[in-house]
């Protein structure tokens, strides 16, 4: 593999010295870029784009051609694992992801098949290898998965949900069934992320998008417990380098101490968490990633720069900060505003590293 030319992102995750704060954006390869829309149209549909290694590589690299980002993130979807388990993933126009065979019973959980990530999800591994080759060592590549709890929300609800009534009914009425499902999913995520690491991912992230809908007690039992299992099962070194792992629970700002105790390297913060407070609480244990409100990218470049400064000052001097949005970039953000954001982080952060 090529020698890494810019390792700021990996160094920051390990709380090692950097010259400026590294920055990338969740969903940086996406619909706000006209070139992404053109490539997606060429692919035909979203999953065809994910399953074509060359096109997945192309959309992964598109934001890097526009902006001096410090990391690339694999272009894929969090629902690849349930799709590999035979739930029949499809996308309804305007509705988002759906499953034709959702989980409704203990019998459904019992019959979920094991899978080989190099077979059923070989297209993801091909994309990882292709992207690593084409990056030529410019920046590191991030691999990712959904968390067991978040995957379960889609698998039991049959798609997106606002109230999660089917899953919460299972959680309270049949907790043993849900634990069995989550345990199978945790094992699958470990296999999947380790396969991504072996294929070339230099850092991995677990997205717990829906952990924030739980009570604190339920979060620990049904989400965090299984993310802890994943952290324990991951390859933490490859190619002679540490492979950092980041956990991100949207709405999880009240549980940072418990998240940091899993042994992960970094925590993602959404925009509702004060980064200064987060650093006071867990900055001696983990790096922090975040956490500008994605909607700030609708503002003027000047206002974006002010917000960047506020967050940099909130984190303060020293190491262990990866700048990002608090969630994914919105599809109708002007690309030039994303560029202003990236440039502001690099231009304004050097003084915090001297």
UniProtKB/Swiss-Prot annotation:
It catalyses: uroporphyrinogen III + 4 H(+) = coproporphyrinogen III + 4 CO2. GO terms for biological process: protoporphyrinogen IX biosynthetic process from glutamate. Belongs to the uroporphyrinogen decarboxylase family. One of its GO terms (molecular function) is uroporphyrinogen decarboxylase activity. This is Uroporphyrinogen decarboxylase. Its EC number is 4.1.1.37. Catalyzes the decarboxylation of four acetate groups of uroporphyrinogen-III to yield coproporphyrinogen-III. Its main location: cytoplasm. InterPro entries: UROD/MetE-like_sf, Uroporphyrinogen_deCO2ase_HemE, Uroporphyrinogen_deCOase. Pfam families: URO-D. It is found in: Cytoplasm. The lineage of its organism: Bacteria, Pseudomonadati, Pseudomonadota, Gammaproteobacteria, Enterobacterales. Pathway: Porphyrin-containing compound metabolism; protoporphyrin-IX biosynthesis; coproporphyrinogen-III from 5-aminolevulinate: step 4/4. Keywords: Cytoplasm, Decarboxylase, Lyase, Porphyrin biosynthesis. Substrate binds at residues 27-31, 77, 154, 209, 327. GO terms for cellular component: cytosol. It comes from Serratia proteamaculans (strain 568). The record marks 77 as: Transition state stabilizer. The keyword Phosphoprotein does not apply.
């Amino acid at each position: 593999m090529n020698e890494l030319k810019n390792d700021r992102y990996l160094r920051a995750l390990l709380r090692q010295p950097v010259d400026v704060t590294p920055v990338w954006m969740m969903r940086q390869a996406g619909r706000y870029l006209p070139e992404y829309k053109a490539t997606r149209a060429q692919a035909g549909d979203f999953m065809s784009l994910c399953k074509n290694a060359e096109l997945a590589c192309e959309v992964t690299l598109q934001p890097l051609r526009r902006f001096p980002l410090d990391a690339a993130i694999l272009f894929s979807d969090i629902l690849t694992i349930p799709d590999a388990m035979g739930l029949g993933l499809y996308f309804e126009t305007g509705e988002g992801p759906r499953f034709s065979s959702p989980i409704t019973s203990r019998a459904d959980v019992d019959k979920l098949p094991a899978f080989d990530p190099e077979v059923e999800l070989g297209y993801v591994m091909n994309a990882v290898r292709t992207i690593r080759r084409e990056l030529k060592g410019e920046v590191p590549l991030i691999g990712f998965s959904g968390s067991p709890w978040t995957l379960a929300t889609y698998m039991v609800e049959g798609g997106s949900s606002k109230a999660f009534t089917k899953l919460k009914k299972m959680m309270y009425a049949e907790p043993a069934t849900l634990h069995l499902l989550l345990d199978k999913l945790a094992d699958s995520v470990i296999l999947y992320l380790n396969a991504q690491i072996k294929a070339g991912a230099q850092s991995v992230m677990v997205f717990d998008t829906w952990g924030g809908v739980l009570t604190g007690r339920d979060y620990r039992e049904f989400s965090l417990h299984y993310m802890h299992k994943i952290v324990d099962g991951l390859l933490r070194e490859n190619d002679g380098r540490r492979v950092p792992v980041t956990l991100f629970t949207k709405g999880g700002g009240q549980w940072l101490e418990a998240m940091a105790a899993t042994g992960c390297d970094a925590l993602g913060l959404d925009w509702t968490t004060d980064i200064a407070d987060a650093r006071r609480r867990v900055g001696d244990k983990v790096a922090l990633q975040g956490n500008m409100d994605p909607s700030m990218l609708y503002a003027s470049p000047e206002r974006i720069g002010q917000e960047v400064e506020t967050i940099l000052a909130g984190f303060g001097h020293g190491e262990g900060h990866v700048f990002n949005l608090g969630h994914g970039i919105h599809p109708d953000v002007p690309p030039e505003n994303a560029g202003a954001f990236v440039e502001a982080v690099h231009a304004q952060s050097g003084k915090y590293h001297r």
